[in-house]
A protein has these predicted regions:
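Conserved ABC transporter NBD signature motif
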Residues: 56-67, 71-72
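Helix-to-loop junction immediately C-terminal to a conserved catalytic motif
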Residues: 48
Length: 275
């Protein structure tokens, strides 16, 4: 679906990616994690063709995204973090834009709008940021494109809406669709995203499935900190402790603890997951 090889990208003199290689497959919902400023949004824009690589290559569905060819654009939908809709009704927007996507399903859009409890007869400009966000997510999923990129989709959503978001994305995923979700609110999407990609300054620290992470790392609660642990952090009544998984059993992954473990123990993690 997406193949990135030896990618370099910089803004003027600010290097963002240095020799990055990465592949994304269909049938998965990727969680794209990283501290602010490491390039999560930049990566999504490169994949969607809004930014051109400095060197190296990025191939998406066998297209060069920077060329923005019609066949490419009809199979990709990108939702920016700060989406603001035009001064027309949501239904008008869907009718106008739906024709650009060969697999767009108007009935699916209507169902998703109902699930999100958003009235399509309202103008975007009359809705809250969260309601606008739900409307564009509903439209994106109804396009049935092969690749959907979401930048911080849970921002602006209240707690019930976040539950709705998890449900509709899970139901809309398929073997043919690749969904990439950039987020710093991992608890909102913890049971949805798999595999996990963690970016650091200039590159990719981790790109692994939840299954492989659970086979190699164990996340446990301990009343006291452990000096032998790879990582530990205070929690209510004790500590979350991360160790190598030396058993034959898979451990439930704590994505927030995983993120901190990877950032603070880069060489150890690199050694554990070396191919």
């Amino acid at each position: 679906m997406v193949t990135i090889e030896n990618l370099h990208f910089s803004y003027s003199r600010h290097l963002v990616f240095n020799d990055v290689s990465l592949s994304l497959e269909g049938g998965k919902i990727y969680g794209l994690l990283g501290q602010n400023g490491v390039g999560k949004t930049t990566l999504l824009k490169i994949i969607s063709g809004l930014l051109k690589v400095s060197s190296g290559s990025c191939s998406v569905m066998n297209y060069d995204p920077a060329k923005r060819e019609p066949g490419f654009l009809s199979e990709l939908f990108y939702i920016p973090e700060d989406f603001v809709g035009p001064d027309i009704t949501i239904n008008q927007f869907a009718k106008l834009r739906g024709d650009f996507y060969p697999s767009y399903d108007a009935n699916k859009f209507s169902r998703l709008m109902t699930d999100f409890e958003v009235n399509g007869n309202y103008k975007f400009t009359k809705l809250s940021f969260g309601q606008q966000k739900k409307a564009i997510i509903a439209f994106a999923l109804a396009t049935n494109t092969k690749l959907i990129l979401m930048d911080e989709p849970s921002n602006g959503l209240d707690i019930p809406s976040k539950a709705q978001l998890r449900r509709v994305i899970s139901q809309a995923s398929s073997d043919e669709t690749c969904i990439v979700i950039s987020t710093h609110q991992v608890r909102d999407l913890e049971n949805l995203i798999d595999p996990i990609i963690i970016l650091d300054k200039n590159g990719v620290l981790l790109n692994e499935s939840i299954e492989n992470i659970s086979r190699n790392l164990c996340f446990e609660f301990s009343p006291v900190p452990s000096e032998s642990a790879i990582y530990s952090e205070p929690a209510l009544g004790g500590y979350v402790v991360v160790n190598r998984n030396t058993s034959d059993q898979e451990c439930k992954v704590n994505i927030e603890a995983l993120f901190n473990t990877v950032l603070l123990n880069k060489e150890v993690i690199k050694d554990i997951f070396k191919k």
